[in-house]
């Protein structure tokens, strides 16, 4: 019985107060989630793998929460180092345990149970070297014909899947990184200082594969090294995990650990050992920022590739093409030599980068390795690890040529590749297999490297911890009205969609993002900050402007950010309360990445609202199917799901239509249709009357005409000055 309810029976509370308190208590901006896992294990699974017998000096119960510092206490107890925390929690020195303690291996049934409860599936994509044998059939035939040896029948599809499944021991706690996998003490402290306590599903499954159960550094011998090189080689990994599940941490920890071991074995040698490729500059800056937090005090340097950075040694003049040497006369040849020599002197003045990990977009690195396309791509023989973040985009036709050129430039025989994304099609898997095989044949490698696929949850599905709303708005004016209702909610009932700032708004094109920003610029009152609370971000802005907008949005100075698919992938905004798809995405994968900007690290309460009009109806079914799959995974009640009649009524797209939609977007909103007056009226983002638009166009035309007249007058003045006779020269 609720005592507060009994005591306030005669008091009429305002509905807005009740609604606001209930809504604000479950928002992503309210703080971090207690458990970052999307598919947490049951209580029975949590106790598995733990010791029943307590060690001497160990407490009966472990604290479930991080200790809160006493700000008013003495100075000696105000702060506590991570090492002291581990001593206080476990009652012994965790570092000593990591060097001398032995971890018992987990039984296979227990490993299977944990991986299944967290919805983790690992598959070896190599063809199994064995075949299934039917003993009854082979026995009968061997009696009749002893001389003839028959081959065993091929594996069935079910047997093949069972043979390819892997069940490695999962990482149940970040403490085991030090005790079992023997990572650096400094790296372990950096992980603890960032507040990482419980590994997410992708970290639980991928870190054991990438780190391996290596012996401790002081116990390693030559025999151990040879055994590890043969039986415990790091695999090529293809990971499909939900958005916001911690993929960056999953590939950065093994990279840093491997580079620190390389520095220990080769002191004084500085070279590029790992490359991380991402599709956007914003994602590159984010990865560098997270990497620098983890590498503090480790001696590992993480840098972003900038224009003009010198990555490889200067190549000789013999790489110039024969056409440049043979074309033209002697004077042109000598001038070309002077130009090349001056360029060579300038490049020699730029110091060679001393970074261990380079993070870049594909075009910047490809241009740096080929001098802007003037030469062949220079090899990178020292790179031992290549990571493709958002690999499905990097291997899409837009970036494929640049990404593959970087991949082929990494000529180290022990190169390992990691492909990470929330969506991964079968075509990307086939391209990965063919590229690895082609590279092995080119380098003459005989041993086939293992390629493992790790899938968390349902493949190509939106995260289940947010609510999805598909809203029919009929026209562009209806979408504007619906968006303003989200900005200024009037109803307090729980049935309506509540969306509190900060949130993102996605549009199809840059022009539409700019138009929507100008339309909503003054919707927030001046008392709350006015137009400074709404901003627009797209690729045509300068780098400094883009970084300023990103910084303002992270600080909370900007509440509503209007953007294109530039921010749809990888960028981590942990406190975003929702996402609005003002224009429907071009594909189901784009929808998964857009709505994944909210609900990061298991945060509940995020909302994804998608508006669609009459022109969008032929393209909505793919998005509706993704929403339906996410609702099934979440266990949404029947009344809150997308109705089945809507899924049945929406038309399906052909393969060619899907390709056109992915490449060009919805036909009615493509830039090529702007010239059509009828279509442009339907898709115009504006509430201005025709008279106001005509007056604006006249004013803009007058300004342009004035600028043209000034330019023409200035040109005439320069010509008249040249025509003036200055007399006879002395």
UniProtKB/Swiss-Prot annotation:
One Gene Ontology term, aspect cellular component: nucleolus
Helicase ATP-binding domain boundaries: 228-442
Basic residues bias (residue ranges): 700-711
Renumbered ranges of motif Q motif: 172-204
PANTHER family: RNA HELICASE
Family to which this protein belongs: Belongs to the DEAD box helicase family. DDX52/ROK1 subfamily.
Subcellular location: Nucleus, Nucleolus
Domain Helicase C-terminal: 482-650
Keywords for this protein: ATP-binding, Helicase, Hydrolase, Nucleotide-binding, Nucleus, Ribosome biogenesis, RNA-binding, rRNA processing
Record Gene3D superfamilies: P-loop containing nucleotide triphosphate hydrolases (3.40.50.300)
Compositional bias ranges of the Acidic residues kind: 716-730
Binding site for ATP: 241-248
Domain free text: The Q motif is unique to and characteristic of the DEAD box family of RNA helicases and controls ATP binding and hydrolysis.
PROSITE patterns: HELICASE_ATP_BIND_1, HELICASE_CTER, Q_MOTIF
Protein name per the record: ATP-dependent RNA helicase ROK1
Main location: nucleus
Self-association and partners: Interacts with the U3 snoRNA and is associated with the 90S and 40S pre-ribosomes.
Gene Ontology terms describing biological process: maturation of SSU-rRNA
Task performed by this protein: ATP-dependent RNA helicase involved in 40S ribosomal subunit biogenesis. Required for the processing and cleavage of 35S pre-rRNA at sites A0, A1, and A2, leading to mature 18S rRNA.
Biased amino acid composition, Basic and acidic residues: 90-112, 220-233, 312-323, 337-348, 690-699
Keyword ATP-binding attached: yes
Annotated Low complexity bias: 15-25
Annotated organism of origin: Coccidioides immitis (strain RS) (Valley fever fungus)
InterPro entries: DDX52/Rok1_DEADc, DEAD/DEAH_box_helicase_dom, Helicase_ATP-bd, Helicase_C-like, P-loop_NTPase
Single Gene Ontology MF annotation: RNA binding
């Amino acid at each position: 019985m609720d005592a507060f309810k009994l005591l306030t029976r005669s008091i009429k509370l305002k509905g807005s107060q009740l609604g606001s308190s209930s809504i604000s208590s479950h928002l992503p901006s309210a703080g971090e989630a207690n458990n970052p896992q999307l598919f947490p294990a049951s209580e029975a699974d949590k106790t598995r793998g733990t010791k029943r017998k307590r060690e001497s000096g160990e407490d009966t119960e472990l604290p479930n929460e991080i200790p809160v510092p006493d700000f008013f206490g003495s100075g000696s107890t105000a702060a506590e180092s991570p090492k002291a925390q581990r001593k206080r929690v476990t009652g012994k020195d965790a570092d000593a345990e990591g060097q001398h303690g032995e971890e018992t291996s987990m039984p296979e049934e227990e490993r299977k149970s944990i991986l299944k409860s967290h919805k983790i599936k690992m598959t070896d994509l190599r063809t199994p070297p064995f075949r299934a044998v039917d003993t009854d059939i082979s026995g009968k035939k061997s009696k009749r014909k002893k001389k003839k040896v028959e081959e065993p029948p091929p594996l069935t599809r079910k047997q093949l899947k069972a043979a390819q499944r892997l069940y490695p021991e999962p990482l149940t706690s970040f403490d085991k990184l030090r005790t079992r996998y023997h990572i650096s003490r400094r790296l372990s402290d950096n992980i603890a200082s960032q507040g990482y306590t419980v590994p997410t599903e992708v970290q639980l499954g991928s870190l054991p594969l990438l780190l391996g159960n290596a012996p401790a550094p002081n116990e390693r011998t030559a025999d151990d090294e040879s055994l590890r090189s043969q039986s415990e080689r790091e695999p090529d990994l293809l990971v499909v995990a939900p958005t916001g599940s911690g993929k960056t941490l999953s590939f950065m920890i093994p990279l840093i650990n491997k580079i620190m071991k390389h520095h220990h074995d080769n002191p004084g040698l500085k070279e590029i050992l790992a490359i991380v490729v991402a599709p956007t500059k914003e994602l590159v800056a984010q990865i560098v920022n997270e990497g620098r937090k983890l590498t503090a005090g480790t001696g590992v340097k993480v840098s972003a590739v900038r224009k003009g950075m010198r990555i490889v040694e200067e190549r000789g003049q013999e790489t110039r093409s024969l056409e440049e040497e043979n074309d033209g006369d002697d004077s042109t040849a000598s001038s070309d030599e002077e130009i090349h020599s001056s360029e060579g002197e300038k490049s020699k003045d730029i110091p060679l980068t001393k970074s261990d990990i380079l993070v870049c977009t594909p075009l910047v690195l490809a241009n740096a390795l080929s001098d802007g396309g003037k030469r062949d791509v220079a090899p990178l023989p020292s790179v031992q690890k290549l990571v493709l973040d958002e690999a499905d985009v990097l291997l899409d036709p837009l970036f494929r040529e640049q990404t593959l050129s970087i991949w082929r430039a990494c000529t180290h025989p022990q190169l390992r590749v990691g492909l990470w994304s929330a969506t991964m099609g079968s075509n990307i898997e086939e391209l990965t297999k063919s590229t690895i095989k082609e590279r092995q044949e080119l380098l003459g490698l005989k041993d086939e490297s293992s390629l493992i696929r790790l899938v968390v949850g349902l493949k190509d599905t939106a995260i289940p911890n947010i609510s999805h709303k598909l809203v029919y708005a009929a026209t562009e004016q209806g979408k504007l009205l619906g968006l303003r209702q989200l900005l200024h909610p009037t109803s307090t009932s729980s049935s309506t969609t509540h969306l509190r700032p900060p949130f993102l708004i996605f549009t199809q094109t840059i022009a539409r993002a700019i138009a929507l920003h100008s339309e909503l610029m003054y919707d927030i009152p001046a008392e709350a900050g006015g137009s400074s609370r709404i901003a627009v971000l797209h690729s045509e802005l300068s780098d400094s402007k883009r970084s300023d907008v990103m910084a303002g949005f992270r600080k909370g100075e900007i509440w509503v950010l209007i953007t294109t698919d530039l921010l749809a992938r990888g960028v981590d905004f942990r406190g975003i309360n929702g996402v609005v798809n003002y224009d429907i995405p071009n594909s189901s994968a784009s929808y998964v990445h857009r709505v994944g900007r909210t609900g990061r690290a298991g945060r509940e309460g995020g909302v994804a609202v998608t508006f669609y009009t009459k022109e969008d109806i032929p393209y909505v079914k793919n998005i509706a199917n993704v929403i339906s799959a996410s609702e099934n995974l979440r266990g949404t009640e029947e009344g809150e799901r997308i109705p089945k009649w809507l899924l049945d009524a929406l038309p399906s797209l052909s393969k060619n239509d899907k390709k056109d939609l992915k490449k060009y977007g919805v036909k009615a909103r493509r830039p090529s249709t702007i010239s059509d007056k009828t279509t442009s009226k339907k898709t115009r983002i504006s509430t201005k009357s025709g008279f106001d638009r005509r007056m604006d166009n006249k004013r803009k035309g007058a300004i342009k005409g004035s600028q043209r007249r000034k330019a023409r007058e200035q040109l005439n003045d320069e010509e008249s000055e040249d025509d003036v006779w200055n007399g006879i020269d002395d």
